[in-house]
Amino acid sequence: MSKRKITDPYNEKFEPFNNYGTPIPGMSWHKITYNQKTGEGTYILKMDPGAKSRYHEHTNFEEFIILDGELIDYDNNVFKKGDIVTYEPGSKHSSYTKKGCLILTFMRGINKPSEIK
């Protein structure tokens, strides 16, 4: 017998996004397989209009797919519905959204808060 879980990203219960300890206003998540201790796994991230992520560094690869809305990176690149984005280890950035967005995120390591330089 298989162990299977089906996730509907539009109808799941979301909790405040607290991956850095303190919840970030306007950001919430639904963990699918994500392990906060190892930073590995998958989660759905919801950002309300006007939400902004903390500036952080990727210790390993992170990939995500924009399921809905759009996300604007610190360098003003705009990621739209259907875009698949990859951040390599050592990448540093923050992102924000004007309209709100829903993102399916695949993590391979813990992101750590960083200073803007």
List each model region and its residues.
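A short, N-terminal "cap"/entry segment at the start of jelly-roll beta-barrel domains
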Residues: M1-G39
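Conserved short histidine dyad/triad with adjacent acidic residue
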Residues: S28-H58, E88-K92
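Glycine- and acidic-residue-biased ligand/ion/polar-headgroup-sensing regions
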Residues: P49, H58-Y74
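Short glycine/proline-enriched turns and hinge-like loops at secondary-structure junctions
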Residues: E57-T59, N77-V78, T97-K99
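Short acidic-glycine-tyrosine-enriched beta hairpin
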Residues: D73-H93
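Ligand-binding loop in jelly-roll beta-barrel domains
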Residues: P89-S114
